[in-house]
Every structure is written in structure tokens, then in C-alpha cells.
Amino acid sequence: MTVSSAPGKVYLFGEHAVVYGEPAVPCAVERRAAVTVEARDDDRIRVEASDLSLDGFTVEYGGTADRRPDVDVPASLLDAATGYIDAAVEQARDAADAPDAGFDVTIESDIPLGAGLGSSAAVVVAGIDAATRELGVELEKTELADRAYRAEYEVQDGEASRADTFCSTMGGAVRIEGDDCRRIDTPNLPFVVGFDGGAGDTGELVAGVRALREEYGFAADTVENIGDIVRRGETLLSAADPGADPTEDLLTELGRLMNFDHGLLEALGVSSRTLDNMVWAAREAGAHGAKLTGAGGGGCIVALDDTRETETALRYTAECENAFRAELDREGVRVEEA
């Protein structure tokens, strides 16, 4: 039996634009998905999902992704527990040259599903890591990140970027631009996350931005402007003292860029009333900046605030189901005690 875990993430800047080759800076945070894998004597896959929502479930099915199990659970849960695990298992089988390997898989996660915190990436990264180790193979992190990206790319019908899976694998803050992925040094960023209890449809939201970008030149310019924000933010981060507490001036400038970024994402149609209300609640509470994180449409916002004010304000905001501090996770994927 092998247990691996991987962190979720927030986007400091750059979601959606990263799909079109612009840079993005996602940051791993201390909310994790853990995947326990135990090899079987046959090629079947048994998936037990818990802590993904209020209801857990267990399914067992043949060793390929050709059939969708007939279980009465939300599609998002089913995709998390079977679609992504199937893709992770196929990558592990390929890496270990064990095409007929079967597994009992248990998923436990404290990352909200579909909320912009990289839940699927964390499950895939941890799943591949645990399954390959269970088969006696230990992957380098760069290969693990690449295989996790390929798994997400398959499940998301070619709409995935490398950002989530690379960030979850490596930990810390990373910079993504096309296939160029690398860690960057940052100070300790004081993230606060607000969750509205919902989840956007990533595929529909990405397709919506694509349609706007193809129809309107100014929408394409908006995507490029998000890339400019990322580059400016990266310049600020590179001049800061890595690992130290950030200065107020740095937080002010980063927050201003986050506010610009949210405005552009809103213009691209990927925000929502609940996300906007949480963003404004955070700003009015004194956050240096706040924006949606992830695909949008519902889910989470991220704010920069080193005080308790933003978290408290979000907890009293009607649209916010949960609010919590999310420290930067510099470790990435790791093996847990079984």
C-alpha cells in the first residue's frame, strides 16, 4: 500500500490567458488531496472517494476508462473519482510497463471540487505518484508533472494547461508559459481564500473565452493584457527577498495587479455575482487585492491580507460558504505514512 498527497493551488495571476501561451503564476497552498493505492491481483480498478463532498461513494469497474460506472452521484464527483483516476492509472501503467495492473484506490481531499483550487490536478499528481511507487517505480518530479498534465489533457478534451499539475507536483510558486515551466522564489504570501460553495464548468468557461477571443479583437487584447499583468507581477516577486515576509509596498503592488486581473477576467465573462461580492467584501475589509482563482463561474476567490480582517469579513458575507487562510506550500507532492 502506498499513500501520496499533493497540494491544491491558487492563481496569483494568469488563469485563462495561460491557455493561449501567456504566462501565469500559480502558487501551491496547504490544502491537500491524498491518494492511497494498493495493487490488486487482477486488472480492475476499485475507487473509494471520501471527503470530496458531503457524500462519499465506492465504485468498482473494469480496468479501462471505456465505461462510465452507473452510480447516483454528481458528475463532478464521478469525474474526480473515475475519469481522473483512470487517466492517472494509465500513466502509471505506462511508466511502470505494467499494462494489466489493477488497483484499489482511495481518495481523500480537503480541496473543494471544481472551485479553482486545483483539486483534479492534486488527485492526478498524487494518484500517479502513489500508483507508480506501488509498482516499484519512482518518477522524477519533472516526469511526474508531465504525465499528470497528459492525464488532465485527456480528461479535459485538450483544454488543460500545465499550470495546475506542475504547481501541485513542485510546490511553491511556479511560472508557466506554454511548455516552459519553472519554480520561482517568492516571499511568504498571505493568502486568504473565500469559497461560495459552488463550482464552475471549466470546459464551458474556457470555451466561452475562446469564442470571445475569436470574435472580438479587444477580447484577444484582454487576454494579452492579463499576460502583461503576470510579467509585471513576476518582476515584483523577483526583486523581493525569497522566503521572507513581504513588505507592505510589495503587497500593495501585487494586490493592485490582482485587482486589475480580476477586472479583466470579469470582462471575459468568467466571474459571477457571488465571486464579485466576495472580492468586494475582501477589498472593503482591507485586503491588498482580491480576485477569482481558477476557471471562475463560481468557486473561490483569493485575497492578499496578513491580518484577520479579510477572513472575518468573508465569513460574514452571505455569498461565502467558507473562508480560510492558505499558506504557501513549498513541498509539493510527497509520500505519506500508510
Label every PLM stretch briefly.
Residues 1-19:
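Short, Gly/Pro- and small/polar-rich lid/capping loops
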Residues 17-21, 26-28, 118, 158-171, ...:
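FAD-binding core of FAD-dependent oxidoreductases
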Residues 21-29, 49-51, 208:
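Short Gly/aromatic-enriched secondary-structure transition segments
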Residues 78-183:
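Gly/Ser-rich oxyanion-binding loop with an adjacent helix/lid
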Residues 3, 7, 34-83, 90, ...:
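C-terminal nucleotide
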Residues 5, 10, 108-131, 287-305:
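Glycine/serine-rich anion-binding loops at beta->alpha junctions
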Residues 13, 21-25, 32-36:
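Short secondary-structure capping/turn segments at boundaries of alpha-helices and beta-strands
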